[in-house]
A protein has these predicted regions:
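Post-signal peptide N-terminal segment of mature Sec-exported envelope proteins
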Residues: 27-51
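Signal that preferentially marks extracellular ectodomain short beta-strand elements
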Residues: 63-65, 101-127, 135-145
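Short beta-strand elements
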Residues: 140-184
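Extracellular acidic, Ser/Thr/Pro-rich low-complexity tracts
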Residues: 63-71, 83
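Surface-exposed, flexible coil segments in extracellular/virion-facing regions
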Residues: 74-122
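A short beta-strand segment in extracellular, disulfide-stabilized domains
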Residues: 53-66
Length: 184
């Protein structure tokens, strides 16, 4: 009775050695964490929805709240104004939101003061597309929405580009002098 049982144990032991790789390497360190994308929290977008009516010269109604799991990343923002079916008429860089101790940033992101000046395209009657693009890296100069990658150090000391991410939100703004007076 012990003979067949012993044979089965020996056979299973021999076969099991084939299933486990014999050349395993154990990492002494965990590889660096990759970059996570930021996002615009949609229920915190102001004004809510996509269609917005705006009388020229009215106060800035636009703001967003951003979440980024990588709390050490500052958040860049760039604002675009488009005429119907056209390339951007203008874009402005907003103030960078600094790193935080929380994933959800407390400070709302609002358009920079330049867009409110009297010659702003949003102060002209008509329909415009107004877009905010956020990034967890730096926008490349004069490149629209292209963002510079993060540099990460690998376990062997080498460097790798860890991509930066963007998110965006678009409002369709109908601007008209015939709208009611501004509301605060």
């Amino acid at each position: 009775m012990a003979g067949p049982l012993l044979m089965w144990v020996l056979a299973l032991t021999a076969v099991s050695g084939c299933f486990w790789p014999q050349d395993d390497q154990v990492f002494s360190q965990i590889p660096p964490k990759r970059n996570s994308p930021p996002r615009i929290i949609l229920d915190q977008v102001k004004p809510g929805g996509v269609d917005v009516s705006l009388k020229p010269g009215c106060p800035n109604p636009f703001s967003i709240i951003v979440e980024d799991p990588d709390i050490a990343d500052p958040i860049s923002n760039r604002w675009f104004v488009y005429a119907p079916g056209a390339k951007p008429l203008a874009y402005f860089d907003g103030d960078k939101i600094p790193s935080s101790t929380k994933a959800v940033r407390d400070k709302p992101i609002t358009p920079p003061a330049q867009w409110l000046n009297i010659s702003s395209e949003l102060n002209q009657n008509g329909e415009h597309r107004f877009e905010v693009v956020i990034a967890d890296g730096n926008f490349k100069a004069s490149s629209g929405t292209e963002v510079e990658p993060h540099q990460k150090t690998l376990l062997d000391g080498g460097l790798v580009d860890d991509p930066s991410y963007i998110d965006s939100y678009v409002w369709v703004v109908k601007t008209s002098d015939s709208l009611p007076a501004c509301s605060e």
